[in-house]
């Protein structure tokens, strides 16, 4: 069976996250409802991962089984149709038709998240939806020093919130970069997979280092505890974005130059 694979971006401000919720509006629900308007029934849509409430996406990937309907025969017509039906805060960036061996979640070999901090107590109007003001002087050199202890393969249990069933809490971080733009600071986190609220908890630990709560090397102690209660508080959700999802050949339709597929496969 052919899979319709979509690359999408969304502003998560008005949504309770990706996954359908009983009493709140979700990204998944809006997309599935749009599909139902055309085919007359619900078509389940599966994403690469469940983003939380208010979390954004620049490069989320999702898939659904191709319906037996004339408007779903070509990728270009699917993209045009969905964008006409979806609200302005959800945009289909690209569509491809893949085989049934592809799975947006289980075929992924890496993801990149970005978290944006602002130094301005009064950010520009639109920035308040995408950046967090931590109310202290950001010491990016200390944050980068602390980030180095998280690189590589570790048990990230101390950085994983409860609420998910994990077969393992071991993950690999390929990159954790603190990019200082002056007015804003972007934390770029790239790894082979992420636990529930893992990125926000990592950002929380780096902010604690920045404000002087503990030295950079204390990150090692947090890792060794393997206990969420010993970890830092999570940073707010609204400044986090899922930026890229990487897939191996032949499923690297949406991969950017940042996705070095061969090296990621070797590291995984």
Swiss-Prot record:
UniProt-listed InterPro entries:
PsdUridine_synth_cat_dom_sf (IPR020103), PsdUridine_synth_TruA (IPR001406), PsdUridine_synth_TruA_a/b_dom (IPR020097), PsdUridine_synth_TruA_C (IPR020095), TruA/RsuA/RluB/E/F_N (IPR020094)
Q: Which GO terms describe its biological process?
A: tRNA pseudouridine synthesis
Active site, renumbered: 52 (nucleophile)
Q: Which reaction does it catalyse?
A: uridine(38/39/40) in tRNA = pseudouridine(38/39/40) in tRNA
GO molecular function list: RNA binding; tRNA pseudouridine(38-40) synthase activity
Alphabetized Pfam families for the sequence: PseudoU_synth_1
Q: Where does substrate bind?
A: 113
| Known EC number | 5.4.99.12
Which UniProt keywords are present, listed alphabetically?
Isomerase, tRNA processing
- Tell me, in a sentence or two, what this protein's role is: Formation of pseudouridine at positions 38, 39 and 40 in the anticodon stem and loop of transfer RNAs.
Family, per entry: Belongs to the tRNA pseudouridine synthase TruA family.
Q: How does it assemble?
A: Homodimer.
What is the name listed in the Swiss-Prot or TrEMBL entry for this protein?
Answer: tRNA pseudouridine synthase A
Organism for this UniProt entry: Chlamydia abortus (strain DSM 27085 / S26/3)
């Amino acid at each position: 069976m052919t899979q319709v694979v979509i690359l999408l971006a969304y502003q998560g401000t008005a949504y309770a996250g990706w996954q359908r919720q009983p009493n709140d509006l979700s990204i998944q629900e809006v997309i599935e409802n749009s599909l139902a308007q055309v085919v007359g029934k619900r078509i389940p849509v599966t994403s690469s991962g469940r983003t939380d409430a208010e979390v954004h996406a620049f490069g989320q990937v999702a898939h659904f089984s191709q319906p037996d309907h004339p408007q779903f025969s070509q990728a270009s017509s699917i993209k045009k149709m969905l964008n006409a039906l979806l609200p302005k805060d959800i945009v289909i960036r690209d569509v491809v038709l893949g085989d049934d061996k592809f799975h947006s979640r289980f075929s992924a070999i890496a993801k990149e998240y970005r978290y944006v901090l602002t130094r301005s107590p009064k950010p520009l109007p639109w920035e308040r939806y995408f950046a967090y003001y931590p109310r202290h002087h950001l010491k990016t050199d200390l944050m980068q020093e602390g980030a180095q202890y998280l690189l590589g393969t570790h048990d990230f249990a101390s950085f994983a919130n409860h609420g998910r069933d994990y077969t393992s809490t071991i993950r690999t971080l390929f990159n954790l970069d603190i990019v200082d733009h002056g007015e804003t600071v972007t934390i770029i986190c790239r790894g082979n997979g992420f636990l529930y609220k893992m990125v926000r908890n990592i950002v929380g630990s780096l902010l604690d280092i920045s404000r002087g709560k503990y030295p950079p090397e204390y990150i090692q102690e947090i890792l060794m505890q393997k206990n969420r209660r010993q970890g830092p508080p999570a940073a707010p959700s609204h400044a986090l974005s899922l930026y890229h999802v990487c897939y191996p050949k032949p499923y690297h339709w949406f991969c950017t130059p940042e996705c070095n597929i061969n090296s990621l496969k070797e590291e995984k």
